[in-house]
């Protein structure tokens, strides 16, 4: 297959490209900077969709960048980097003389309302209660194509765990130093997925003709934030009991953004499993041991 990957130069895109190449597929990236095996977003807008069998969009400014203040400027970047790239790809697919057979978008579990008791599968309601859930609703709407000539899949991803990037890039040092612990109360759910499995689900969605609609990109075993901290500490052979106070999280990220760390959702990959995807890392302990090894 020839696969076009928007925003493919980041942590998830690199893992997906490696897996697709290993499975014999040809990958072209869409990015801001030109280079071998790439086209730019401007080229896509001007020349339309290059010939491809499938397209994926992973583009989006990192919401939890601690170096960026949560102000109106950054919020516009967060929204624009997702909606504009998705709209551009969707428009290019619609106009293509031979549209791709599959179109996959990665969004987030922020669609579901944080809760200490609720359990969410792909059919659960959401998408209308705060900044982030509304963003996911608009983002997924931007990807929708008229007709059914192209198979459409949305993967709502949890926190992506992997070596050399993503959430682990910020967390490993304090945990290695024995200074790690739960965030806030630690009671909030922590919907997670190993980078290998997120790349695996995306590849499964591209290759399997029966897959369509929403898939939850989370591991089948749920954990709270405190359980995650304890399990990561154990994988490193360190104690992990020093909590990061809610007030500190709110001071660094702003109240609205801090919700993503201080509250969480129990998300079940019901449809993902039903499509036949087999997880490489269904359990948190094994996933973290592989990452820190």
From Swiss-Prot:
Q: In which tissues is it expressed?
A: Expressed in adrenal gland.
One GO cellular-component annotation of the UniProt record comes to: mitochondrion
Under Enzyme Commission nomenclature, its number is 1.1.1.-
> What's in the keyword line of the UniProt record?
NADP, Oxidoreductase
Which Gene Ontology molecular function entries are recorded, alphabetically?
A: oxidoreductase activity
Per its UniProt entry, what is the enzyme's top EC class, as one word?
oxidoreductase
Pfam families in alphabetical order: DUF1731 (PF08338), Epimerase (PF01370)
| Residues at which NADP(+) binds | 31-32, 58-59, 77, 82, 160
Known function: Putative NADP-dependent oxidoreductase.
Family membership noted in the UniProt record: Belongs to the NAD(P)-dependent epimerase/dehydratase family. SDR39U1 subfamily.
Instruction: Give the miscellaneous note.
Output: Despite its name, it shares more sequence similarity with the sugar epimerase family than with the short-chain dehydrogenases/reductases (SDR) family.
Name this protein carries in UniProt: Epimerase family protein SDR39U1
Query: What species does this protein belong to?
Result: Homo sapiens
Recall the taxonomic lineage recorded for the source organism. Eukaryota, Metazoa, Chordata, Craniata, Vertebrata
Point out the gene that encodes the protein: SDR39U1
């Amino acid at each position: 297959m020839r696969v076009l990957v928007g925003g493919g130069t980041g942590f998830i895109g690199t893992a997906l490209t490696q897996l697709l190449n290993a499975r014999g597929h040809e990958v072209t990236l869409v990015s801001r900077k030109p280079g071998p095996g790439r086209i730019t977003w401007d080229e896509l807008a001007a020349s339309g969709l290059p010939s491809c069998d499938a397209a994926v969009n992973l583009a989006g400014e990192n919401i939890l960048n601690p170096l960026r203040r949560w102000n109106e400027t950054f919020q516009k970047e967060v929204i624009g980097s997702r909606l504009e790239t998705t709209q551009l790809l969707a428009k290019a697919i619609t106009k293509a003389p031979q549209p791709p057979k599959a179109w996959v978008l990665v969004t987030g579990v922020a669609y579901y309302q944080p809760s200490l008791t609720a359990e969410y599968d792909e059919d659960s309601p959401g998408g209308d209660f705060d900044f982030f859930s509304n963003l996911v609703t608009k983002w997924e709407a931007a990807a929708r194509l008229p007709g059914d000539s192209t198979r459409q899949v949305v993967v709502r991803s949890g926190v992506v765990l992997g070596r050399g990037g993503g959430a682990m890039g910020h967390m490993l040092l304090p945990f290695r130093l024995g200074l790690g612990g739960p965030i806030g109360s630690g009671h909030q759910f922590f919907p997670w997925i190993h980078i290998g499995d997120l790349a695996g689900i995306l590849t499964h969605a591209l290759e399997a003709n029966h897959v369509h609609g929403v898939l939850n990109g989370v591991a089948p075993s749920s954990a709270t934030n405190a359980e995650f901290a304890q399990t990561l500490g154990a994988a490193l052979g360190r104690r992990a009991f020093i909590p990061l106070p809610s007030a500190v999280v709110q001071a660094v990220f702003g109240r609205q953004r801090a919700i993503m760390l201080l509250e969480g959702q129990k998300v079940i990959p019901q449809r993902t499993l039903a499509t036949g995807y087999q997880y490489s890392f269904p359990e948190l302990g094994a996933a973290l041991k592989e990452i820190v090894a």
